[in-house]
């Protein structure tokens, strides 16, 4: 089991903001690693999760390759990839993931929670923790691209303070929010 870190974001000058573990009220957000592949593939095995995003449930082997690629980080030095699996502390279940593609001022967010754990507020809780972490590390704008018929993701975006814009990309609406600037510590 993991030691209990303090709630909220923590980084040091030598730690990338996209590779630190995070903690919310009920979840440990752990940087993605290939060893999460089997649990993550099982958690996300419901084909209904792909209704709005396309694709199919990944096999454990496909998920291992994906986790390794994501853990390696972006090949573009102008952006960082942050990918965290969500571990429910109450029972240890790996329930999904959140991710952020972080550029100089903007982070694009995504969240997926497996069907058995939906409607419990876990995606909102995890994404809110991620947003607080990104704001604390200097990100000023958060965006998410959401299919117009994906009402559950739109509700999460609203709960996070994101608002739909008139812009679309690949048929998805761009949602956006300005994040608060970090408060300087003295």
Roles of regions detected by a PLM:
Residues 55-57, 146-150, 154-157:
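Catalytic cores of transferase enzymes with a strong primary signal for eukaryotic protein kinases
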Residues 119-136, 151-159:
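Conserved acetyl-CoA-binding loop-helix of GNAT-fold acetyltransferases
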Residues 1-115, 132-133, 137, 145, ...:
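GNAT-family acyltransferases
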């Amino acid at each position: 089991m993991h030691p209990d870190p303090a709630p909220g974001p923590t980084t040091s000058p030598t730690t990338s903001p996209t590779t630190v573990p995070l903690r919310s009220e009920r979840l440990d957000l752990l940087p993605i690693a290939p060893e999460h592949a089997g649990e993550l593939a099982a958690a996300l095995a419901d084909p209904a999760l792909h209704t709005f995003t396309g694709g199919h449930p990944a096999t454990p082997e496909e998920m291992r390759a994906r986790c390794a690629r994501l853990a390696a980080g972006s090949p573009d030095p102008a952006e960082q990839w942050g990918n965290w699996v969500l571990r429910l502390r109450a029972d240890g279940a790996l329930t999904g993931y959140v991710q952020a593609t972080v550029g100089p001022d903007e982070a694009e967010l995504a969240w997926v929670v497996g069907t058995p754990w939906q409607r419990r507020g876990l995606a909102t809780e995890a994404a809110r923790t991620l947003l607080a972490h990104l704001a604390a590390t200097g990100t000023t704008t958060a965006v998410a691209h959401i299919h117009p018929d994906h009402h559950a993701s739109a509700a999460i975006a609203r709960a996070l303070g994101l608002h739909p814009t008139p812009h679309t990309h690949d048929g998805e609406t761009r949602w956006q929010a300005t994040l608060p600037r970090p408060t300087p510590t003295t």
